[in-house]
């Protein structure tokens, strides 16, 4: 519905940055179509300025942002607040909202759309986010970096560039960056193929570990740091991929075998903690109390012990991962037997990527029809398990019709950042959502950029978004020098023992 509004010049001629609110306009009861869609989202008080533009054809746009006594008017087709303006607006709206009014001109006629709010939570978010930037392809994986972005502004820097140690046929791939308790000074990532090894940085010291050993299935893959011990649990995976010609899921990444191992960073010792040949364990994650390890596992028994690969490909739809946990004693470093947490196979689904909220109350995971690598599954959604009540539900308020996959909690447990392919089904972008004390999520918002159209023009996917308390200070060249060293081989032990 539209109605014509005519206001006096004295009441409406608001000026800011040379922009004016139009005197005469039609009024619409519809929300404006803007990109990114920041209508009625909830944001942390310390987030970088939200920029947006009209998503469609328009001759001009004017927007007024109001919070308390603060008011700013923007024009020129897009809203790009500077840092000082945005900070004043956010501080004035903390615990409340920034009111946004958008006026659009088409063919000489102005329309004022239904105002919307940007709710400003007093809950802050960790100031840094790291991720791997990679083309959504299996061909150009060498041209990738691990980057870090300050969430309080638009500053971005490279933690490590994969091409620093790649040399023609001697290619390399880096992956699986991970931190101990959001601490950027305690980090690990893997270098694969040429000069391969696991890089571990701990309070300024960097070492390269050769984790391959005859007593374990493979070198470590997906990691999780213990909250305070110098201990990392990894999955070990024999991984393959196939390409579909008809299925809407273009690529299927799968494990034919996988186990869990524990690695003592200080003693350089490794041991198996789950290696049942009929179970495929993956994606471990520590509970914040350091006394429980969560992971997912699929039961799969081969009928043909010789042609495993071909058999697995013909039975991929049978592979359903459930969620499990194991108790752990931090004093003795001993694990208890596994316990079932959520039987996804009972509803003909597959659950992966368990992540526990910092207060230990909620377990967020990714659910899809089958398989383990849900980033390639268009039906993948985020689900939440209340560990106190046992209730499990789909996070409909966060999910989209396309892929939602990897997710990371903020250190205060009030935010999650997650990977989504909601725009085009191909490129993975980071979205952020507020989670209240009842486990309810808010409408998610896209990572803000200085140019509102940046992500639609950027031809890389954001892979494995991880929040951090600050920036990684080690320079890319320092990591490159460590990668060029000989790897220190791990020692296999039947049982880890605490050093006294």
What are these regions (language model features)?
Residues 17-500:
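Sequence signature of WD/YWTD-type beta-propeller architectures
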Residues 1-23:
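Bacterial Sec-dependent N-terminal signal peptides
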């Amino acid at each position: 519905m539209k109605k014509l509004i005519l206001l006096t010049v004295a009441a409406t001629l608001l000026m800011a940055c040379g922009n004016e609110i139009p005197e005469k306009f039609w009024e619409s009861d519809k929300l404006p179509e803007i990109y990114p869609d920041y209508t009625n989202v909830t944001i942390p008080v310390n987030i970088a300025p939200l920029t947006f533009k009209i998503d469609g054809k328009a001759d001009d746009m004017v927007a007024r942002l109001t919070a308390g006594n603060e008011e700013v008017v923007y024009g020129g087709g897009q809203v790009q607040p500077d840092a000082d303006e945005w900070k004043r607006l956010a501080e004035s709206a903390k615990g409340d909202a920034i009111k946004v009014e958008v006026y659009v001109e088409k063919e000489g006629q102005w329309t004022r759309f239904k105002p919307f709010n940007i709710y400003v939570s007093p809950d802050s978010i960790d100031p840094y986010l790291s991720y791997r930037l990679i083309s959504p392809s299996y061909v150009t994986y060498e041209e990738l970096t691990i980057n870090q972005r300050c969430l309080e502004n638009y500053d971005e820097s490279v933690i490590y560039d994969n091409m620093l140690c790649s040399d023609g046929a001697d290619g390399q791939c880096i992956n699986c960056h991970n931190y101990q308790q959001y601490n950027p000074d305690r980090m690990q990532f893997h270098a694969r193929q040429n000069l391969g090894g696991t890089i571990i940085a701990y309070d300024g010291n960097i070492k390269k570990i050769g984790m391959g050993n005859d007593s374990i299935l493979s070198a470590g893959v997906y990691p999780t740091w213990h909250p305070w011990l110098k201990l990392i649990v990894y999955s070990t995976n024999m991984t393959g991929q196939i390409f579909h010609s008809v299925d809407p899921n273009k690529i299927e990444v799968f494990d034919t075998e996988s186990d869990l191992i524990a690695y003592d960073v200080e003693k350089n010792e490794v041991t198996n903690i789950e290696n049942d040949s009929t179970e495929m364990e993956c994606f471990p994650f520590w509970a914040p109390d350091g006394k429980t390890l969560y992971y997912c596992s699929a039961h799969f028994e081969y009928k043909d012990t010789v042609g495993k690969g071909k058999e697995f490909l013909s039975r991929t739809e049978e592979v359903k991962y459930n969620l499990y946990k194991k108790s752990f004693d931090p004093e003795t470093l001993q694990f208890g037997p596994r316990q079932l947490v959520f039987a996804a196979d009972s509803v003909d689904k597959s659950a992966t990527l368990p992540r526990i909220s910092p207060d230990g109350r909620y377990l967020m995971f990714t659910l899809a029809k089958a398989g383990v690598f849900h980033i390639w599954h268009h039906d993948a959604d985020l689900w939440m398990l209340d560990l106190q009540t046992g209730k499990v539900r789909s996070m409909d308020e966060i999910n989209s019709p396309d892929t939602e996959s990897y997710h990371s909690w903020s250190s205060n447990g009030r935010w999650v950042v997650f990977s989504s392919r909601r725009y085009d089904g191909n490129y993975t972008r980071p979205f952020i959502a507020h989670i209240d004390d009842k486990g309810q999520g808010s409408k998610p918002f896209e990572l803000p950029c200085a140019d509102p159209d940046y992500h639609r023009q950027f031809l890389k996917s954001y892979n494995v978004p991880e929040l951090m308390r600050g920036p990684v200070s080690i320079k890319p060249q320092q990591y490159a020098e460590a990668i060029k060293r000989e790897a220190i081989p791990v020692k296999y032990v039947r049982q880890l023992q605490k050093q006294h």
